[in-house]
Amino acid sequence: MERLQSHRDFVTVLKRRRKAGGKDIVVHYLVPDDHHDDDDRTVHRRLGLAVSKSVGHAVTRNTVKRRFRVLARAHEDLLPAHCDIVLRAKPSAATASFVSLDQQIAKAFATVAHKVAEA
């Protein structure tokens, strides 16, 4: 899974207002219009992380980001082949257990896949 790097990419995903979430996370997603069909064998998923200072100090924020990266890679097969994802942490993510975050991300990614399949 590649990274969303530019501010423009983050803004594009966040402006679309398509999201799924749980108690501790919000998943914003964008599927490009020209990649709705899965005939193309290449996979192009990009991940961005948004962890604000309301989550905690730098050490806490970095811990949350590290957990998000690991969990996103573990569950990326649930996502459509071509999509941009921004995982946004709520302040409660700092105290959430790894198992809880794992379940929430799996459920949110499955919800994203379901919503994209319906569209």
From Swiss-Prot:
Does the UniProt entry include the keyword Hydrolase?
yes
Q: Which domain of life is it from?
A: Bacteria
Q: Which GO molecular-function terms appear in the entry?
A: 3'-tRNA processing endoribonuclease activity; ribonuclease P activity; tRNA binding
Transmembrane segments annotated in the record for this chain: none
Q: What Enzyme Commission number(s) does the record list for this chain?
A: 3.1.26.5
- InterPro entries, per this entry? Ribosomal_Su5_D2-typ_SF, Ribsml_uS5_D2-typ_fold_subgr, RNase_P
UniProt keyword list: Endonuclease, Hydrolase, Nuclease, RNA-binding, tRNA processing
* Cellular component GO terms, alphabetical: ribonuclease P complex
Reactions the enzyme catalyzes:
Endonucleolytic cleavage of RNA, removing 5'-extranucleotides from tRNA precursor
Spell out the Gene3D superfamilies in the cross-references.
Answer: 3.30.230.10
Can you supply a Gene Ontology BP term from the record? tRNA 5'-leader removal
Q: Does the keyword Transport apply?
A: no
**NCBIfam families (UniProt xref):** rnpA
Job description of the protein: RNaseP catalyzes the removal of the 5'-leader sequence from pre-tRNA to produce the mature 5'-terminus. It can also cleave other RNA substrates such as 4.5S RNA. The protein component plays an auxiliary but essential role in vivo by binding to the 5'-leader sequence and broadening the substrate specificity of the ribozyme.
Q: Which family does it belong to?
A: Belongs to the RnpA family.
Subunit description: Consists of a catalytic RNA component (M1 or rnpB) and a protein subunit.
Q: What is this protein called?
A: Ribonuclease P protein component
Origin species, per record, is: Bifidobacterium longum subsp. infantis (strain ATCC 15697 / DSM 20088 / JCM 1222 / NCTC 11817 / S12)
| Name of the gene | rnpA
